[in-house]
Amino acid sequence: MNQNNNGDALLTGGITRDCIESAYCFIHQKLRVFEYSTNPMQRDDIEYAIAQYVEGMNPQLYLLLSQGRTEFLLDHVNFEKDMREAQEKLEGMM
């Protein structure tokens, strides 16, 4: 494991432990609200928030999580399943 200038542990592909923990916390929190929400607007807002997060996410981390699937976390039909998968993978990386 290497250290970058900020002292963050660098994992393979330039992904820091902080990056993984941040993504896990964000996805975990949004998933918990999403799975219990009965408000369609709130669920849409969560999908939008995740899409915005993905846009700014470390590209190497997204590639690792998505396994090359370009619509990962961005497809309405598979959104909840993708969030669960991302959360599990991120938890395993911590």
Where are these regions (language model features)?
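Short terminal alpha-helical segments
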Residues: 2-38
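Generic alpha-helix initiation/capping and coil-helix boundary signal
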Residues: 16, 42-44, 79
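Short amphipathic alpha-helical heptad-repeat segments
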Residues: 19-27, 50, 54-61
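Heptad-repeat amphipathic alpha-helical coiled-coil interaction surface used
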Residues: 24-27, 34, 43, 50, ...
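Amphipathic alpha-helical interaction surfaces
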Residues: 33, 52, 56-63, 89-92
